[in-house]
Amino acid sequence: YEADWKNYYAGVYRCNELISREETIEWKETDSKRGTYMGECRTIRALLYFDMVRLWGNIPLFDEPVNENRPQAEPSEIFALIFDDLQYAIDNIPADAYPKANASSNDGHITRYAAEALFARAYLYYTGYYGTEPAGVTRAQALAAVEDIIAAGEYSLVSEYKNLWPAASAGVAEIGDMETLYGTYAGDGNSETVLAMKFTSSQDYNGNNDGNRWQVMVGMRSLDAAPYGRGWGGLTVNPAFVSEFKSGDTRRSASIIDLVGEGISSLPDFQNSYNDQREYT
């Protein structure tokens, strides 16, 4: 986790740099967006710390851009900053900053509703894991956050669970036939998306660039065709998990790649290279 540790704190440092310079920035015509930009920055910092405190527990806390070693802080101190940052975002990002109607093009941005969702999620985690309320934050605040999201009327479940993913939305489709696969896909920024983390497709096998490393780790070996992409073939599905799905449960085919049922195991590349993969991946 050394690389993750460094990358997380590099992100925190960048956020701290911007936050520390807020009063010296010549906002001019962008002054109306000042709260939005700073709210997004502070939400990113909160999200970074939320990940780190769950990964490592006691960690050094930096809320300013300094080059020094600091002792570990208690999780309660980390969460105090998390909630403070998210509350700032809730108070300063206008509800119409990034309209849901334009989500397909701006769904990497952080909205007020994304900050509210993270606020409620952090509250649930803290009370569930530590068995007490975080100092200065109440259940009423967390409830108000999610109720505001609901009241906005911009979010809802998609009609079919499988449509959340291109590969699952069309059922068994010709490998590489993206027109069919995207035919029923709910799309980027769909009605279920409150906060989207954007990735590029430029990741390589050495961990470089900014792509989705998760895909590199778990993607099927030897297959380059969309929608699966090539990977290391890790995290194959436990058969016991597969058997938990009852007959006719459509969530199974939406969640698990069936190498035989989807025709993957009969592809020449698969037969010639890695035909020892498990039935489900």
Indicate residue ranges for each PLM-predicted region.
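Short coil/turn linking the two alpha-helices of tandem helical-hairpin repeats
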Residues: V53-L55, P60, A97, A122-P134
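Elongated scaffold/linker segments in the mid-to-C-terminal portions of large proteins
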Residues: Y1-N7, N67, L157-T281
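Structural register within alpha-helical repeat arrays
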Residues: M38, R45, F119-R121, Y126
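Conserved, well-structured interaction surfaces
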Residues: Y1-W56, V66-A80, L86-A101, T281
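Proline-centered turn/helix-capping motifs that create local helix->coil transitions or kinks
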Residues: M52-P60, E154-S159, Q203
